[in-house]
């Protein structure tokens, strides 16, 4: 067993204050802590829940040191240096021997952006087998925006209050009409797998996502970036916060390396 000085575990507040996550906290809503899970509410009806976790910084250290037939029971200062070296030199496999399982509720269009990198394992709610719910994403007034510029070189700007409210009203009306059509079709005997075709991509879905730290960092680098759509950035911010809590040394090395997965 190593005789090096054991690292003091910084508090969540300390990690957030020094990691850059603090700038993003206002993008996510309330946080619920229970003995079984950690939940962050996102958007109007969504959430990210850390359903299960088998991950810490020591798992990275031991995965790397197994090449030398070494194993440690606790972190010390040298281990932080090792993790930073692995991150900086892009030695990625030691970051794969761990697991996070998330339960997510998000609009369908967010879920499709989430699945696109195809990292991790997914199981999603199916409107083929279960009745659809009438929960839909209606953006907050400040999130209604207009696109300025050309594709590949554009920015988003807020709209005036009148257009923001008109947009919200229009979305709510479309959602109500779509769900009413869905219910009519089901009541008339149309199979759910076909009736679901009328449901818009603003409808909420749920899924489980199991992922290791290396893939998780890749997701964060893509979906928490300023170029990602605002709605999925809110979810990525929540995922990032939960990742930082469980693997603080790895997370700090990730940020120091330019937020690029090894």
What are these regions (language model features)?
Residues 2-262:
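Family-specific signature for flavin-dependent thymidylate synthase
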């Amino acid at each position: 067993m190593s005789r090096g000085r054991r690292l003091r575990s910084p508090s969540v507040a300390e990690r957030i204050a020094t990691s850059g996550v603090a700038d993003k906290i206002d993008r996510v809503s309330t946080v619920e802590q229970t003995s079984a899970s950690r939940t962050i509410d996102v958007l109007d009806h969504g959430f990210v829940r850390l359903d299960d976790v088998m991950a810490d910084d020591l798992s990275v250290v031991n995965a790397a040191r197994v090449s030398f037939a070494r194993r440690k029971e606790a972190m010390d200062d040298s281990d932080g240096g090792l993790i930073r070296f692995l991150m900086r030199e892009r030695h990625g496999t030691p970051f794969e021997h761990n697991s996070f399982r998330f339960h997510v509720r998000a609009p369908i269009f967010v879920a499709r952006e989430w699945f696109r990198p195809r990292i991790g394992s997914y199981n999603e709610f199916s409107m083929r087998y279960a009745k659809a719910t009438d929960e839909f994403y209606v953006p907050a007034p400040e999130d209604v925006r207009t696109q300025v510029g050309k594709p590949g070189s554009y920015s988003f700007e807020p709209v005036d209050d009148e257009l923001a409210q008109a947009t919200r009203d229009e979305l709510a009306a479309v959602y109500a009409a779509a769900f009413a059509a869905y219910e009519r079709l089901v009541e008339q005997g149309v199979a759910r797998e076909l009736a679901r075709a009328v449901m818009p991509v603003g409808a909420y879905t749920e899924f489980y996502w199991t992922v290791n730290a290396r893939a998780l960092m890749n997701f964060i680098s893509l979906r928490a970036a300023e170029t990602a759509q605002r709605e999925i950035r809110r979810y990525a911010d929540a995922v990032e916060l939960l990742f930082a809590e469980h693997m603080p040394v790895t997370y700090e090395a990730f940020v120091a390396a330019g937020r690029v997965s090894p």
